[in-house]
Amino acid sequence: SVAVVENGRSFCGVLDCPAKGEVFAASIGGGSRMNGITLSVGEPSDELKVAGPKHFVVPFANMQSKQVEAVGHVPSLAYRIALIAAGRISASFVKPNAHDWDLAAADLILAEAGGTLVRADGSRPLYAGKTVSHGVLAAGHPSLMQGMLGVVAATSIG
């Protein structure tokens, strides 16, 4: 993945997943697309598909009135976040030490599809600064963030 970043924010980004034949792209105010098709996270359904470390997913599932399915390991963090933008995954917890190069394009792709990626304090991450790694993050539909951040706050690694 690659992104153009200015003042800590991504302005355009592309994620290529050649194994799946999928190319995700986004620009500020221009929406997100996969292979030319507009993406939207959509409202969370009755069954949430949540990815990330088990010590976050299990407590999150326990506090939901909806059924939660734990998503198996997706080896590319950027692709996992893009899957949220495409509506294939509802949300993902991101363990500490993710890097700008894993996040900058995917963050914009998710945001332009109506989702959000936030730090444990609820703020959006900044990119291309003095520090290029991040703490725990939560990604998904904005309506899921309060519950996700509650789990992060209650977990010692958060």
Model region roles, listed by residue range:
Residues 13, 26, 41-42, 127:
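Short capping micro-motif at the N-terminus of alpha-helices
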